[in-house]
A protein has these predicted regions:
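Polytopic transmembrane helical bundles with strong interfacial aromatic enrichment
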Residues: 1-36, 40-50, 54-138
């Protein structure tokens, strides 16, 4: 693993406790906030946001195991190292920020951040996949 990739991994590992904090926050809503239980849309989007944050953060770490093996320029490797973790921010942000009001009955405009996150994720994954396929065995 290159020093730059190792640094990215360290940053991502340091960020993982924020997802843990998010889970504790949702648990707190479930236990102490009766209004939270009255809004299934908010419950579902908060749950989706938390799940996407955790899964995409772990995926970002897994990807770092492969990125240095890809037959790509350093610029494209940077795209992978940055786009996939960025998706772990944009997708959950879309879910959380779109229903911040406890009485929300539909997602607000922030839900469109999900499309940005999806575009970043797909770009990063396709780039890595193509780079790995292009790699010739030694």
């Amino acid at each position: 693993m290159s020093p730059e990739t190792r640094k990215h991994a360290g940053i991502l590992i340091v960020i993982i406790p924020t997802v843990i904090y998010g889970g504790v926050s949702i648990l707190n809503f479930l236990i102490n906030d009766p209004a939270y239980m009255q809004n299934p849309l908010r419950q579902n989007l908060f749950r989706a946001g938390h799940a996407h944050a955790g899964v995409l953060l772990i995926l970002s770490l897994v990807v770092l195991l492969y990125v240095d093996e890809a037959n790509l320029s350093n610029g494209w490797k940077s795209v992978i190292k940055n786009f996939i973790p960025a998706a772990a921010i944009f997708l959950p942000a879309a879910f959380f920020f779109s229903v911040l009001k406890p009485d929300a009955t539909k997602p607000n405009g922030f839900i469109n951040l999900a499309y940005v996150g999806v575009a970043l994720l797909v770009t990063g994954l396709l780039t890595l996949g193509i780079g790995l396929i292009r790699r010739k065995t030694n």
